[in-house]
Amino acid sequence: MSEENVVYIGNKPVMNYVLAVVTQMNGGTSEVILKARGIAISRAVDVAEIVRNRFIPDIQIENIDICTEEIIGNEGTATNVSAIEIQLRKD
């Protein structure tokens, strides 16, 4: 999976990420991965569900990976942050 098929979910409105996924799918890509960490995880789930239910009904959720990443802060302290990857595939 190339890096251009990955949509990183952050603090922007949900519809911005939905548009990014729909644009990639309409451009000929058959697979897109949504990646999010921390509080953006719920936004990533929202993006996947909006794309699946409203825009591209024949899209499938191929795989969901969850993990915990260790982030090193400015003071050198380690913080655990939850992360998710949602793999979407269009047949």
From Swiss-Prot:
SUPFAM superfamilies: AlbA-like (SSF82704)
InterPro entries the record matches: Alba-like_dom_sf, DNA/RNA-bd_Alba, DNA/RNA-bd_Alba-like
Keyword Nucleotide-binding: no
Gene Ontology BP, a term: chromosome condensation
Localization terms from the record: Cytoplasm; Chromosome
Keyword DNA-binding carried by entry: yes
Keywords, comma-separated and alphabetical: Chromosome, Cytoplasm, DNA condensation, DNA-binding
Tree of life domain: Archaea
Principal cellular location given in the protein's record: cytoplasm
Pfam families, alphabetized: Alba
GO molecular function: double-stranded DNA binding; RNA binding
GO cellular component terms listed in the entry, alphabetical order: chromosome; cytoplasm
Function comment: Binds double-stranded DNA tightly but without sequence specificity. Involved in DNA compaction.
Family indicated by similarity: Belongs to the histone-like Alba family.
The protein, known as: DNA/RNA-binding protein Alba
